[in-house]
Amino acid sequence: MAELSANYNYLENEPKWQDDWQKKNIYQWNSTLPKDKTFIVDPPPPTVSGDLHIGHAMSFIQLDCIVRYQRMLGKNIFFPIGFDDNGLPTERFVEKIKNVRASNIARPDFIKMCQEVVIAKEGEFCKFLNAIGLSVDWSLKYQTISSLSCKISQMSFLDLVNKNQVYRNHQPVLWDCIDQTALSQADVEDKERITSMYYIAFAVMNSELKVQIATTRPEMLPACCAIFFNPNDIRYQHLHNQFAITPLFKSVVPILAEETVDINKGSGLVMCCTFGDTKDVAWWRKHNLPTRIIIDYYGKVKPLDFTVSSQNQEKFTEYYNQITGLKIAQARNKVVELLHHNQLIIKQEQISQTVKQAERSGAILEIIMAPQWFIKVVEHKDALLQKSQELEWYPKSMKIKLDNWINSLAWDWCISRQRYFGIPFPVWYSKREGEEGKIIFADISQLPVDPLYDLPAGYSKDEVIPDSDVMDTWATSSLSPQLSSHGISSNLTIDSTRHNQLFPADLRSQAHEIIRTWTFYTIVKSYLHQNSLPWSKIMISGWCLADDRKKMSKSKGNIILPTELIKRYGADAVRYWALTSQLGHDCVVSEQVIGIGKKLVNKLWNAARFILQHITGKLTAEFLISAKHCVEKKVISCTTDLWMLSKLQDTVNNTSNLLNNYEYASARLYVEEFFLKDFCDNYLELVKSRIYDHSSEYQKSAIYSVFWGLKTILELFAPFVPFITEELYAAIYQSNNLCNGSIHSSNKWPLAQNFYNDELILTTGNLAINILTLVRKSKSARKLSVKAPISLLQVKYDSDSYQQLPSDLVDDLKLVTNSNEFSIVTNFTTIDDLITGDGITVNIVYPGSMKHEC
């Protein structure tokens, strides 16, 4: 039998097991087993937009703990890993590290550059995920930019076209002037800023009246198409259906009632421009207002290309020409200057304002008109809320985030992006005479296609215009369950057998900040394609916080790379930290907690070394059979051993229940407390003397119990700290041919019914632990060694109840406390040190101490 070294070398052992698990295909999915025997997970494909940090490690480790548990239960595991390596986030990353702008180089050259970067970065990602002990099946790896993913994503698009759930329209879109692309509602975040509110004088047509309109965007005056007031605002009811004259530009615009106008904001009158914000869009649609677009794709005032009803067309053109070509902020300053010059600004005040900002570039968004592809979501809000209700949420509190997002939806999902490195739309536009502008869709049999290089059947190159846009990256990553199943729905697949085996999945794991994107879009796609949920359960992790308690993110530059932490403490210690955070709760990176994890790993090693030292020469097949028989057939003879096995049964039972509900943090704590307190601090101390004593009739009971207890502890810890548990399991059990396979193999989870359980034994054993605790407290107070002798140890119950302890338990207590005599009494005779706790009083008489008679 191999001996364990004095210290555990994680730097040597962790890479060893990473290689071993892969070589032996420990985590391989078995495609021959049916769906009901398989646990299918849909993990987040990391975005190739920078380094993976400790926050990614936290989320993946939490999922991996659940996956390892399910595998040990006996489930066939489908645990893929994907990389979201297309779209705007990846493009921005490539632009940054290559110091280029995609718009300034040839499209093929930029795409090639992106491909080279993602291949290198994904190699780093794989090393990272291996280092933290992720139990994925690497043969299931996918990339969202791959040919297969492109085919599946384009299949999804065409299926939604056929189901009339996709449309193309020239309509208002959220526009990022930095990245030069349309964005969806989910790509946007709110930004608070201080700005100026200008109260501007408008004339009322055919009247001497002047009205004030408050706006933060005076540069939009030439795009003004109406004035609104709340119909309940008595100040302006007399103006209904009259006309206002815009300052400077002298446009004639109607004054209309609109119940969504905030009476208390500004003057209560508001101008509607095309388009200053999303309210303008809603009012423009509702009231069928004219369109006057003045902002171009670059965030500048475009040349005048529309006509308006102005009382002075010459002045309109004169003032407009003064702002043409200016950036928005410059145009605003110029219009304010002109308004001041004409004494049209009544007052100006500083306000706090919330504006829409691009999540990636940070650009303040504009709203422009552009032809884009959209997926219908607004009309499905009720159905999507029902799907949210059907989904099992862990924790339940996260459901409201999705519900609130669905309820807030005002726009359909814009999936067009005016970028380069993404999934192309399988679309062309006809130039053929008589069908100019006709949309031509690829046939599914052609997929994947790139319309820039491929042609639709029956058309020549000169007869079509390719759609040069690419899809929103979420349009593909939202298909992550289908990217694994190789099918869109049961009626549209690449591999129908595989799709039916894997779709829908069992569990989605992700962080809460992408509920409005990845969760929502995946549910949308699954609902529209197959009228089902993509998975039955979803577990949501919290944020990983930096030392300043701010969310850790690549964009904020406050990330902590786990490489140094793993080198300093080991991957198991980092996993320990990640599994201290309750599901859905934010977790601060704490080297102190990681250090506690390292101490736990060392404690496991040292406990195993101690046990091994005392069963040397006994580890034979017969020994294993005898130990298994004695434990599982409940024929262990000593009370202390039975108490430990009863506590172990409780631990197995409670840990299983907690992990079944994805409460990994509570499960880890339960196992840890049993190991440290019950097993190491108390049980091993109680039985240590019996293990040493070869003449004791109870030695075999102790050795069998210790041996089986350690094996079970390693199995319970395996989902949490896989490297140390595998090392010890291999050294003690595999190397002696006592167990087959990895501890992380199928059917290695302990069964609660295989352990002794007796409430009386538990009560009796707990009493013994209470006595031991009080003795330790007494010796500590007297600054005595734990081995200090005791002449007389007496126990008196505080209540009328009276219970003698079994003689074998008394023997263990006397040995561990080094007591000459032990008794349970109703009254003390000689008193030395009285100490009380948990329903009992203990009298401890030390040799040579001052004592008195009662």
From Swiss-Prot:
Enzyme class (EC, first level): ligase
Protein name: Valine--tRNA ligase
List of residues binding ATP: K554
One example of a Gene Ontology biological process annotation: valyl-tRNA aminoacylation
Reactions that this protein is recorded to catalyse: tRNA(Val) + L-valine + ATP = L-valyl-tRNA(Val) + AMP + diphosphate
Function of the molecule: Catalyzes the attachment of valine to tRNA(Val). As ValRS can inadvertently accommodate and process structurally similar amino acids such as threonine, to avoid such errors, it has a 'posttransfer' editing activity that hydrolyzes mischarged Thr-tRNA(Val) in a tRNA-dependent manner.
Naturally occurring in which organism (per UniProt): Orientia tsutsugamushi (strain Boryong) (Rickettsia tsutsugamushi)
Entry keyword annotation includes Cytoplasm: yes
Main localisation: cytoplasm
Localisation: Cytoplasm
NCBIfam families named in the record: PRK13208.1, valS
Short sequence motif 'KMSKS' region: positions: 551-555
